[in-house]
Amino acid sequence: MRLLTCDCTFMGQKHSGSVSVEKKNQENDGPPTYEIVFGWSQSFENLMKHRAGQKYFAEFLKGEYSDENILFWQACEELKREKNAEKIEEKARIIYEDFISILSPKEVSLDSRVREIVNTNMGRPSASTFDEAQNQIYTLMQRDSYPRFLASNIYKTVMGTFGIKEEAV
């Protein structure tokens, strides 16, 4: 059994979480239950630990022209699960080209301090090369996009499949 972990900072406080692969797969099989979907409104962490939550959130972000944020976050999670050193280096370079490079159409918005850390880390890519950048993007999505997602038609429609009206959400 492997653990998937995310260590992020939000409003100056450390956020840590881990989910076993077996449990995660059980939670993600089939359509989400009411409890799972309602849980998405209780915390961003709940939303992000479910494949369906990420799917609906990505759909929302695509409509806001900011889906590069979740795509980057997901790519970083995949990189952290990789154990083969050669594949880690290859995946890190792809992530850099796709999301960090100023030439990329999917460039994520990072402050100069974090961008410099990533550039330094790319000298010797590892599974943690993008940790600072991933934390910054996670926080950005949590503060900025997540509240709008909860008020979006996408989330209201998903809740509506359980007979829940807008007022209750």
UniProtKB/Swiss-Prot annotation:
Query: What do mutants without this gene show?
Result: RNAi-mediated knockdown in ASH sensory neurons results in hypersensitivity to dilute quinine.
Q: Which UniProt keywords apply?
A: Phosphoprotein, Signal transduction inhibitor
Q: Which GO terms describe its biological process?
A: negative regulation of signal transduction
GO molecular function of the protein, one example?
A: GTPase activator activity
- Output the PTM entry: May be phosphorylated and activated by egl-4.
Q: Which Pfam families match?
A: RGS
Domain named RGS is located at: 39-158
Tissue expression: Expressed in a subset of neurons including ventral cord and head- and tail-ganglia neurons. Also expressed in non-neuronal cells including pharyngeal and uterine muscles.
**What SUPFAM superfamilies does the database record attribute to this sequence?**
Regulator of G-protein signaling, RGS
Q: Does the keyword Metal-binding apply?
A: no
Tell me, what does this protein do in biology?
Answer: Weakly inhibits G protein signaling in nervous system, interacting preferentially with the G(O) subfamily member goa-1. In vitro, it acts as a GTPase activator of goa-1. Rgs-1 and rgs-2 redundantly adjust signaling when worms are fed to allow rapid induction of egg-laying behavior. Modulates chemotaxis responses by regulating negatively the sensitivity to quinine in ASH sensory neurons.
According to UniProt, the name of this protein is Regulator of G-protein signaling rgs-2
Question: What organism is listed for this UniProt entry?
Answer: Caenorhabditis elegans
